């Protein structure tokens, strides 16, 4: 793990934003995580309607591009299990992965994602757009 990896320090920051967070359970989360966080984090998936688009958000260790959830034509599957950033249109859906802020893979920088004005942007910590896709 990176030297800066400090999940306990992130807890107060996340709790301060609890009304703005939709979270899903990852493959390493446990009930103790739910005990310290003030918003739900144990759901396997979350379906969001943003700007008229349906996002199926999941961690990705169960549902992913190799084991698709019940998507409709044009839906967006977003997951982060692999820690590898992706933003690509598939035949019947769009696949998004914001990468990882703490343990990025495949030589990528630490990244996060923003969805704004119909554009999914993956950014590094300096705010540079690393990858984007218009949805």
Where are these regions (language model features)?
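Core catalytic region of metal-dependent phosphoesterases/phosphodiesterases
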Residues: 1-50
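Generic detection of short hydrophobic beta-strand segments and adjacent strand-loop junctions
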Residues: 48, 131-135
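Short catalytic-loop micro-motif centered on adjacent basic/acidic residues
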Residues: 23, 56-57
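Generic structural signal for conserved hydrophobic packing positions in ordered secondary structure
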Residues: 14, 48, 57-59, 99
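Conserved beta-sheet core of the metallophosphoesterase superfamily
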Residues: 54, 61-132
């Amino acid at each position: 793990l990176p030297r800066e990896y400090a999940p306990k320090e992130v807890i107060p920051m996340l709790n301060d934003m609890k009304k703005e967070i939709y979270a899903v359970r990852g493959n390493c989360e446990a009930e103790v995580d739910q005990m310290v966080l003030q918003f739900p984090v144990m759901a396997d998936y979350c379906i969001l309607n943003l700007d008229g688009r349906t996002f199926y958000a999941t961690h990705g260790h169960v549902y992913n591009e190799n084991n698709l959830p019940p998507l409709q034509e044009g839906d967006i599957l977003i997951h982060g299990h692999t820690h590898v950033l992706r933003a690509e249109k598939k035949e019947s859906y769009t696949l998004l992965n914001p990468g990882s802020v703490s343990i990025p893979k495949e030589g990528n920088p630490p990244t996060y994602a923003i969805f704004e004005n119909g554009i999914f942007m993956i950014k590094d910590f300096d705010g540079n757009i690393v990858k984007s896709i218009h949805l």
